[in-house]
């Protein structure tokens, strides 16, 4: 099976119980042609991660972060392509951040899976870019050239002005993923 969705990410993780915690198999990162055939799913869960479709700010190169920018038409067509790719895959639960772009992406995908609940989780929102949100890279460079270069080279060392660090995002998202994982048992 080959899955490729323009400018979108679709990843599949198979989780199964292990003696030292869950065992994870990565099934797909847009193309599975390089992988060996999968064994039967067996016990455990399969998680499909889909990045939201394009927005006008993505297209323009603006830092979005936590500003709630909706999908554009191309983003909706990307979500429809993900829906089509996943139409025959059984889905029994779905999660999204509380922002409209991932929520709409999920709703479009779930239109082929009626009755599947979509739970929104605050902790899954994107990194808060603070004062950089809504700005083009050239605008950020004008005021924060050194910090922008550091962000490109070592993002884990940067706290954007009035924004979050990678560690902040990690802490809140891990809590959310643990909540999701515990609901799969």
Region spans (language model):
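Short glycine/proline- and acidic residue-enriched helix-loop micro-motifs
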Residues: 147-168
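Short, solvent-exposed loop/turn segments at secondary-structure junctions
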Residues: 18, 32-34, 54-56, 100-101, ...
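Acidic, low-complexity terminal tails and accessory targeting/binding regions
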Residues: 2-49, 130-139
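Short, intrinsically disordered, charge-balanced linker/junction segments flanking boundaries
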Residues: 183-185
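A short acidic, helix-capping loop that chelates divalent metal ions and anchors anionic groups
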Residues: 58-59, 127-132, 157-161
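Active-site-proximal alpha-helix that buttresses catalytic centers in soluble enzyme cores
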Residues: 42-116, 143, 164-173
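Helix-turn-helix-type domain boundary/helix-start signal
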Residues: 3, 69, 158-159
């Amino acid at each position: 099976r080959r899955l490729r969705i323009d400018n979108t990410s679709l990843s599949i993780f198979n989780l199964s119980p292990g003696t030292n915690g869950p065992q994870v198999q990565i099934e797909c990162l847009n193309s599975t042609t390089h992988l060996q055939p999968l064994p039967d799913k067996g016990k455990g869960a399969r998680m499909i991660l889909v990045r939201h479709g394009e927005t006008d700010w993505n297209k323009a190169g603006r830092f979005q972060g936590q500003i709630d920018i909706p999908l554009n038409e191309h983003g909706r067509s990307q979500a429809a392509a993900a829906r089509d790719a996943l139409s025959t895959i059984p889905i029994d639960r779905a999660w999204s951040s509380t922002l409209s772009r991932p929520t709409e992406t999920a709703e479009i995908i779930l239109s082929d899976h009626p009755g599947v609940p979509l739970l929104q989780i605050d902790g899954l929102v994107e990194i808060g870019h603070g004062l950089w949100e809504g700005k083009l890279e050239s605008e950020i460079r004008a005021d924060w050239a050194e910090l922008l270069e550091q962000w490109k080279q070592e993002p884990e060392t940067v706290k954007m002005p009035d924004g979050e660090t990678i560690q902040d995002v990690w802490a809140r998202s891990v809590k959310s993923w643990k909540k999701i994982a515990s609901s799969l048992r």
